[in-house]
Amino acid sequence: MSYVYFIESTNGSTYIGATINLEKRIRQHNKEIKGGALATSNKVLNGEVWSYVCYVENFPTYNEALKFEWRWKQISRILQKKNPKLTPREKRLEALKMLLELDKPTSKAMLYSDYIIKPNVVYNN
């Protein structure tokens, strides 16, 4: 299964990514094992820790997850320009809400209605 995830650092920085293994990926971001993104690794070197805010599951392919990830980041940037007072977390969550209200994430993506199971958001409590 493929996932698109939203993580937040202890200082409030945010990151959106895609993976097939959530447990391994968060360990990579926190530099417990090799393979984290440069953007998150630098924060860890400064003592920050990353944790999941939420993730979206049920993508039929990894490619569909990547399309969703790209669009989530794009909507987040648009929201930041429209309302710079939003916190990074607010911006990401609002973008996710808007993205899930669409029929599909991008013009070349599958319709959500064609997924075997519709995208589902799982929040970390």
Label for each model-derived stretch:
Residues 6, 16, 56, 60, ...:
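Compositionally biased, intrinsically disordered low-complexity regions enriched in proline and serine
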Residues 1-3, 48:
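Residues that flank catalytic or metal-binding motifs in active/ligand-binding sites
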Residues 3-9, 13-20, 25, 29, ...:
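GIY-YIG nuclease signature motif recognition
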Residues 66-67, 73-125:
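Boundary/linker segments flanking structured domains
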Residues 2, 12, 26, 56, ...:
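Generic intrinsically disordered, low-complexity segments enriched for polar/acidic and small residues
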Residues 22-64, 71-90:
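Conserved short loop/helix modules at catalytic or binding sites
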Residues 7-9, 33, 116-119:
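Generic alpha-helical secondary structure signal
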